[in-house]
Curated annotation (Swiss-Prot):
One of its GO terms (cellular component) is membrane. Residues 1-70 form a transit peptide. Belongs to the bile acid:sodium symporter (BASS) (TC 2.A.28) family. It comes from Arabidopsis thaliana. Pfam families: SBF (PF01758). This is Probable sodium/metabolite cotransporter BASS3, chloroplastic. The chain crosses the membrane at residues 110-130, 145-165, 169-189, 198-218, 238-258, 261-281, 288-308, 325-345, 387-407. InterPro entries: BilAc:Na_symport/Acr3, Bilac:Na_transpt, Na+/solute_symporter_sf. May function as sodium-coupled metabolite transporter across the chloroplast envelope. The gene is BASS3. It is found in: Membrane; Plastid, Chloroplast envelope. It is a multi-pass membrane protein. It comes from the Eukaryota.
Length: 431
């Protein structure tokens, strides 16, 4: 079967439309039109008014049988492919996880969805034209990271931390996965691949930082526990003031000297202070937060781009060397295993969590704040040690959101892959 369609940019959500009527058509060649109209969404204003608000497919029936139909979003959100059997008929599934998710969409989701593409473009720009990011000095790196942390803080309230006392088990499981399993996995991977000393300490440091802010968006895509994701990310980020210097001293202190006290002070300045400021603003200055919230996701995205591009451009020659290219396999391996480890650790008898919580812990374990690791590596270990952290941002953003999209769809990979193979079903589709 071959489906040919010329699609303009579709709206962020599509209502479900059954194709059961199609099977009642006579066997001879006839046409059947389906229109999939958009539902209301807070993001509707983001789309140009000149764009069509519906998709129109014309299916031509030639023989008896079923017509598999694929719907793929080309909105700024992660594209989704849905294939759903119901009573022997096919249905188009709604985009973006349903209307309830769409109604909660805001600018933060829009910029978060763009982040993987911005990360990839930043890496390409930094390596192909280093002057585009070499101007980002260490003096600018810390404020940029502070901007990312402030964007976390303005989303928090005192009530959020009260959840920690109501749900201690999943939070504890996430902490253990973050600060025990992940650092040990990093040491195992680094030694297994014989990572050179040029990058070893920076790689281990990257494995010892807290979860990334992007994991909260990934949790929403994967239909996981978003509230737990925000709580876990925020808590581990605050706890990094103690755990990251402690783990770094224990795991890499024998390789390179680590000033744990100075590192703790640095984390306090660029992590805890901005988050606390954001929390205070969200508690006592709501009008200020109302003004900041629409722009902070964009600010965080720009800051992330600067924190990635700087170490990549400065260390371009080392990255493109044989040793630098050798980082790809261990970093991909680390993140892939970390996602699996976080998920299955939460399924151990006695600790077993609900599926939504397990997905959250998996994403928080596999996606860490590599930008923080890059800053600490630049300040305390040398500029070359920041390279693993910069590479990690690119890998974890792409892998994490792909995993989240897969979970969010709820469909098997082989169902999606089978659609790319032409089959003789006797149907064609014309847009």
């Amino acid at each position: 079967m071959t489906l040919i369609a010329s699609l303009s940019l579709p709206p962020p959500a599509i209502q479900r439309q059954s194709l059961s009527e199609f099977h009642n058509l006579p066997a001879k060649s006839q046409s059947f039109n389906c229109q999939f109209r958009s539902s209301s969404s807070p993001l509707s204003s983001l789309h140009s008014s000149s764009l069509s608000n519906f998709l129109d497919f014309r299916l031509r029936r030639r023989n008896s049988g079923l017509v598999p139909v694929v719907a793929c979003s080309t909105t700024p959100f992660m594209g989704r492919v849905g294939l759903h059997w119901r009573d022997g008929n096919m249905s188009l599934l709604s985009f973006c996880g349903g209307t309830d998710v769409t109604e909660k969409a805001d600018s933060s989701q829009f910029w978060s969805a763009l982040l993987p593409f911005v990360v990839a473009l930043t890496a390409v720009a930094a390596l192909s034209y280093p002057p585009s990011f070499t101007w980002v000095s260490k003096d600018l790196y810390a404020p940029a990271l502070g901007g990312i942390m402030l964007s976390i803080g303005i989303q928090l309230s005192v009530d959020d931390f009260a959840l920690a006392f109501k749900r201690p088990v999943p939070l504890s499981v996430g902490f253990v996965a973050q600060y025990v399993l992940k650092p040990l996995l990093g040491v195992l991977v680094a030694n297994a691949f014989g990572m050179p000393r040029t990058f070893y300490a920076g790689f281990i440091l990257t494995c010892c930082v807290a979860g990334a802010q992007l994991s909260s968006y990934a949790s929403s895509l994967s239909k996981a526990d978003v509230a737990m994701s925000i709580l876990l990310t925020s808590s581990t980020t605050i706890a990094s003031v103690i755990f990251t210097p402690l783990l770094s001293g224990l795991l890499i202190g024998s390789v390179v000297p680590v000033d744990a006290v100075a590192m703790s002070k640095s984390i306090l300045q660029v992590v805890l202070v901005p988050i606390t400021l954001g929390l205070v603003l969200n508690t006592y200055a709501k009008p200020v937060v109302t003004l900041l919230q629409p722009v902070m996701p964009f600010v965080a995205m720009v800051c992330t781009s600067l924190c990635i591009g700087s170490p990549l451009s400065i260390n371009r020659s080392q990255i493109l060397s044989a040793e630098g290219l050798g980082l790809i396999v261990p970093i991909v391996t680390f993140h892939a295993v970390a996602f699996a480890l976080g998920y299955w650790f939460s399924k151990i008898p006695g600790l077993r969590q609900e599926e939504e919580v397990s997905r959250t812990i998996s994403l928080c374990t596999g996606m860490q704040s590599s930008t923080l690791a890059g800053l600490l590596a630049s300040q305390f270990l040398g500029s070359s040690q920041a390279v693993p952290a910069a590479c990690s941002v690119v890998v974890m953003a792409i892998m994490g959101l792909c995993l989240a999209s897969f979970w969010g769809n709820g469909f098997r990979i082989r169902d999606v892959l089978s659609l790319s193979t032409p089959q003789s079903t006797g149907y064609t589709a014309e847009s």
